[in-house]
Amino acid sequence: MRDPLSSTIKTIQPSGIRKFFDIVSEMKDAISLGVGEPDFDTPWHIRDEGIYSLEKGRTFYTSNAGLKELKIEIAKYLDRRYGMTYDYNKEIMVTVGGSEAIDIALRAMLDAGDEVIIPQPSYVSYVPCTVLAGGTPVIVELKEENDFRLTAEELEAVITPKTKILIMPFPNNPTGAIMEKADLEAIVQVVKEHDLFVISDEIYSELTYVDKHVSIASFPGMKERTVLINGFSKAYAMTGWRLGYACAPETILKQMLKIHQFAIMCAPTTSQYAAVEAMKNGDEDVAQMREEYNGRRRYVLHRFKEMGLKCFEPFGAFYAFPSIKEFGMTSDESATKLLNSKKIAVVPGTAFGECGEGFLRISYAYSLDDLKEALGRIEEFVTELRAGMDNK
């Protein structure tokens, strides 16, 4: 019998994020700091709206592009938060999480062989989605000495005549890096000069801890060449509701909608009604959760400093990315040893690209009690490793 599988799909590796999570779920007294999921419940008034929609029998398909009411609220949100104006009817669509939006944007925009510039370390979906869309990933290694920000010089160095899209993964998973206005201005100049398009993944836009998030789409001349992707999972603690959105020029959005129609039909109806409430009345919930995350962020950095573990200061998302290079182990070896010896699960930096070697991703989207216990065990681990090195 001939091989039933696509040669392309066989080149795609499973996500490295879930590997240690699956192991720790079967391990007694283990603590996972590996999954990027808020530990908060979805705020009650948002859940209540979802329940009410079910009680009212709102269980039918919505428009392929999403509920009109939700798209209107998304447009209002973008205007009040970032001063950006989008036509809810032509430039906004609701997706099954931000991940679907990434996938269909790439499929709608790429021809075979088109190059997509992907800064790494970054979210695990960008490379496989590019490959599955027929594109060619071109990796830019973000450097710790640049605060894991993308520089115009790094971008310029990898552009070729085949380059079509730049993915902007900021605030960044796994590093927590952000791009400030001055950083983006330099990138915008290069993008315009080379006539590139941008897919800006802004799922952590509400979780920034210095100033306010700046969207690359807000710069003059950039809205028409940017697909802005966001969602409800991180800011509103709605991961299981599976809801995101894409904002793009009508010419791009129409083609994204084709793929969405045939593959998905529409995003979950109940989730969309709940999201209307989140958009209307969720700002205070987001602010409270952001404040809590910021307290945890400061605590994690303080503890790393106490144990002498080098860690770049993250200003976005809810991750820390400490360096373990001093111990002479790979990221995977270090994460495995930490799990087996101290029952703490983290994610090797290499899950987010080869340039993540020498780092671990630690999520602080966990209770302070769990963080205190976990960091105590990590300190023991670090102390034992250093003692072992001294005895050699």
Where would I find each of the regions flagged by the language model?
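Intrinsically disordered, tyrosine-centered linear signaling motifs in cytosolic regions
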Residues: 60-61, 204
